[in-house]
From Swiss-Prot:
Ubiquitously expressed. It comes from Homo sapiens. One of its GO terms (molecular function) is RNA binding. GO terms for biological process: neuronal stem cell population maintenance; positive regulation of neurogenesis; primary miRNA processing; regulation of DNA-templated transcription; response to arsenic-containing substance. It is found in: Nucleus, Nucleoplasm; Cytoplasm. The modification N-acetylglycine is found at G2. This is Serrate RNA effector molecule homolog. PANTHER family: ARSENITE-RESISTANCE PROTEIN 2 (PTHR13165), SERRATE RNA EFFECTOR MOLECULE HOMOLOG (PTHR13165:SF0). There is a cross-link at K150 (Glycyl lysine isopeptide (Lys-Gly) (interchain with G-Cter in SUMO2)). Residues 370-387 have a biased composition (Acidic residues). Residues 1-90, 271-412, 575-598, 835-854 are annotated as: Disordered. The modification Omega-N-methylarginine is found at R833, R840, R850.
Length: 876
């Protein structure tokens, strides 16, 4: 029995050893290295055998259920969690067990952090899988870190002690100027060949871009004047309760911009009739038609089953499907009448396929990505539905081929030019040109245009892109075909761009007040003056200088605008009645605060204001109430997408202070739009290194005049030899005039970039400042950064999760006085479970008693500091 028990115990222990993790295998190897002399543990084996015999009879045929092994033999096995889970601040652990897990709460032990300032870990390894999926380069090379400007204190260390303070300040200012000049030149050389940079500053590209922008602006102006002449603006008010009429007007403007005719505008009336002709039992689909750019009634019936599947997934689509949630009412009735609705759908699709050709394919493409995921339990139903959908698709296609024959001599059907399908590309590398994307997407039918956003310096000048297609295409099929295509080692990874959910959005209803409306008329007129002059929209010729602001504008909507800016007062009546000062209250003060007034609405002023705001929105793509300009809107999928209007009337009375505060805040927001594009003065440009074209040409000629020997000179551009340098110079100007022109254009290219006060640049990296005496910051947060829950993901150090929000984690508040070390022992590098203990309240404030079970470092240095002593911080 002894030998069999030996084997029994060994097998039991080996079984549990095999289930242990790598953390315990080193101990297993150590034990086996010492040999399998189990007689040394006879005391333990005997004790366990006796304990089994005392409590029950031993039976070999009976399956034993063993409790976990004893603690002195191995760590307890009932929990798959290590000791540092409970004691995350234990300094004895090496910190290298889980390098992929993050330790929160503060600085960590372990390998040193990457180069550079801790605020600049952009696109680090922990976000690579996500970024690679979204279309960025698979392996991102951060390259050489950009140089950081020295602080004045660091600069003083490089100077001799004999330099006095005035000279040191002067030298430091010269150093800063040289540093910025060098940074600017390096940036120019790094990006001069990229399309976005050349289109902004190169003289040839700038001219083309201005001409295209001017042509698009004049087209929008013609559309606005056409709509105004046909009476589209006569009874239109920019109030939230007129949202349907506003959307209809925006759609009409888009149809006109796309080259549509009055006949094409009839489709807006047809859509409205179809919406009103819906069944009374069904929920109203007018709002849905607004939000999704007006889907037809026949389209909805055709895809009735798709809507039923979508109802179960509405919770995932918060922002895009607000209006569709109404469909969930009466799902039971829809399910009971499923077969009838399918038959009606087929009939309606046959009747309306001439008006809505290709709508079925759009419906499949316009649903959100989350709705495209299929469930395994519905495989058979989906297969049947797919077959039916294919049959329904084939019928419209057959009739589409017959349609041109029938309509050859008949009236043309109105085209839905205001509806489009589009793809969104999140990350487009700066070295990819628009022409490359256009040539790639032109292969697919229905392609219309490409829009690219401005490059983002914080994302390595990557851009976002939108590719617009005709409404009749199957956008999901095109998206799938483009999914794995790479351009210049960059994955495009397109996604289907959803339709706008709320095209009309409202702001505070206080904007209906008469005083605010009059102020808005003044600001809107000033904006129109500024934008018209900047774009030279009303100039007779492109070369004509803009009209001075003192002269009346040729813009017809500004005619007699001053009549509405003059406020009429009853001064004589007040004098006769004996009013000493200020206008008398229009009505006796009611109960409550007498300083409060009712919102007074003047319909005449509002009508004048709305015409100005529509001019800004349609012609200049400026949303007045949102105080922003929509750039490149002509290239976007929606050429007139969103507009902000006045909200409902405030239910309560308003104070005079609220009116003044609103006006002041609104004018501050509009200031950037009113300001003229800034450029450097001549003096500042010279300091920054402005280049002279003549000097640069001389440098070019000198560098291409090489002396080979006595009376022997070479022109390296052509390889010809001459007897003197003057002959080489004459040869270059005569035979290489295009090279001279290139030099002059390059100088103008650089000077255009230099004189732009808002020129793009790398994000400035500021050295870390020591915390001030009253500065309290969460761990891992540096001055100038937002709080952890607002910090961009790319700005977090490598391998660490976001630090706890202020007041909720370990060391959430640092001591006000800087000490020699951290307030608490640091969490080890890669603390398990994301340092969950930090969120359980261990150490919410300095001085809180620590958990007695947590082992502290016995070698911790006891430090004494005079709290009354001034901080050892130098200020310059």
């Amino acid at each position: 029995m002894g030998d069999s028990d030996d084997e029994y115990d060994r097998r039991r222990r080996d079984k549990f050893r095999r289930e242990r993790s790598d953390y315990d295998r080193s101990r297993e190897r150590d034990e086996r290295r010492r040999g399998d002399d189990w007689n040394d543990r006879e005391w333990d084996r005997g004790r366990e055998r006796r304990s089994r015999g005392e409590y029950r009879d031993y039976d070999r045929n009976r399956r034993e259920r063993f409790s976990p092994p004893r603690h002195e033999l191995s760590p307890p096995q009932k929990r798959m969690r290590r000791d540092w889970d409970e004691h995350s601040s234990d300094p004895y652990h090496s910190g290298y067990e889980m390098p992929y897990a993050g330790g929160g709460g503060g600085p960590t032990y372990g390998p040193p952090q990457p180069w550079g300032h801790p605020d600049v870990h952009i696109m680090q390894h922990h976000v690579l899988p996500i970024q690679a999926r979204l279309g960025s380069i698979a392996e991102i090379d951060l390259g050489v870190p950009p140089p950081v400007m020295k602080t004045f204190k660091e600069f003083l260390l490089s100077l001799d002690d004999s330099v006095d303070e005035t000279e040191a300040v002067k030298r430091y200012n010269d150093y800063k100027l040289d540093f910025r000049r060098q940074q600017m030149q390096d940036f120019f050389l790094a990006h001069k060949d990229e399309e976005w940079f050349r289109s902004k500053y190169h003289p040839d590209e700038v001219g083309k871009r201005r001409q295209e922008a001017r042509g698009a602006l004049q087209n929008r102006l013609r559309v606005f004047l056409s709509l105004m002449e046909t009476g589209w603006f006569d009874n239109l008010l920019l109030d939230i309760d007129k949202a349907d009429a506003i959307v209809k007007m925006l759609d009409a403007a888009v149809i006109k911009m796309e080259g549509g005719t009055e006949n094409d505008l009839r489709i807006l009336e047809q859509e409205e009739e179809e919406e009103q002709a819906g069944k009374p039992g069904e929920p109203s689909k007018k709002e849905e038609g607004r939000a999704g750019a007006g889907l037809g009634d026949g389209e909805r019936k055709t895809n009735d089953k798709d809507e039923k599947k979508e109802d179960g997934k509405q919770a995932e689509n918060d922002s895009s499907n607000d209006d569709k949630t109404k469909k969930s009412e009466g799902d039971g009735d829809k399910e009971e009448k499923k077969e009838d609705s399918e038959k009606e759908a087929k009939k309606s699709s046959k009747k309306r396929n001439r008006k809505h050709s290709g709508d079925d394919s759009f419906d499949e493409g316009s649903v959100s990505e989350s709705e495209s995921e299929s469930e395994s339990g519905q495989a058979e139903e989906e297969k049947e539905e797919a077959e039916e959908a294919l049959k329904e698709k084939e019928k419209p296609k057959e009739e589409e081929w017959e349609k041109p024959k029938d309509a050859a001599g008949l009236e043309c059907k109105p085209r839905p030019l205001h509806k489009t399908c589009s793809l969104f590309m999140r990350n487009i590398a700066p070295n990819i040109s628009r022409a490359e994307i256009i040539s790639l997407c032109k292969r697919y039918p229905g392609f219309m245009r490409v829009a690219l956003s401005e490059p983002q310096p914080e994302r390595r000048f990557f851009r976002r892109g939108w590719v617009t297609f005709d409404r009749s295409v199957n956008i999901k099929e095109i998206c799938w075909n483009l999914q794995n295509i790479r351009l210049r080692e960059c994955e495009l990874s397109p996604g289907v761009n959803r339709d706008l959910t709320r095209r009309v959005r409202n702001i505070n209803g206080i904007t209906q007040h008469k005083q605010i409306v009059r102020n808005d008329i003044k600001l809107a007129a000033k904006l129109i003056h500024t934008l018209d002059d900047r774009t030279q929209l009303w100039a007779s010729e492109p070369g004509t200088p803009p009209l001075p602001t003192s002269l009346p504008s040729q813009n017809p909507i500004l005619k007699n605008i001053t009549d509405y800016l003059i406020e009429e007062v009853s001064a004589e009546e007040e004098e006769l009645l004996g009013s000493s000062g200020g206008a008398p209250p229009e009505e006796p003060p009611k109960e409550g605060n007498p300083a409060e007034i009712n919102v007074e609405r003047d319909e005449k002023l509002i009508k004048v204001l709305d015409k100005l705001l529509l001019y800004l929105r349609i012609v200049h793509s400026l949303d007045y109430y949102n105080t922003c300009e929509y750039p490149n809107e002509d290239e976007m999928p929606n050429r007139c997408g969103i507009i902000h209007v006045r909200g409902p009337m405030p239910p309560n009375r308003i104070s005079h202070g609220e009116v003044l505060e609103w006006q002041k805040t609104f004018e501050e927001k509009l200031t950037p739009l009113l300001s003229v594009r800034e450029s450097l003065s001549e003096e500042e440009a010279q300091k920054m290194g402005r280049k002279d074209p003549e000097q640069e040409v001389e440098k070019f000629v000198t560098s291409n005049t090489q002396e080979l020997g006595k009376d022997k000179w070479l022109c390296p551009l052509s390889g010809k030899k001459f007897k003197g340098p003057e002959f080489v110079r004459k040869h270059i100007f005569n035979k290489h005039a295009e090279k001279i022109e290139e030099v002059k254009k390059e100088v103008a290219f650089f000077n255009n970039f230099l004189t732009d006060a808002k020129r793009p640049a790398l994000p400035e990296i500021k050295p870390a400042q020591p915390p001030g005496p009253a500065q309290i910051l969460p761990p891992g947060l540096t001055p100038g950064l937002p709080y952890p829950h607002q910090t961009p993901q790319g700005l977090m150090p490598y391998g660490q999760p976001r630090p706890p929000i202020l007041g909720y984690g370990a060391g959430a508040v640092r001591p006000a006085v800087p000490t020699g070390g951290p307030p608490y022992p640091h969490a080890p590098y890669g603390a398990g479970r994301g340092n969950y203990d930090a969120f359980r309240g261990q150490g919410g404030y300095p001085g809180k008693p620590r958990n007695r079970m947590v082992r502290g470092d016995p070698r911790a240095i006891v430090e004494y500091r005079d709290l009354d002593a001034p901080d050892d911080v130098d200020f310059f």
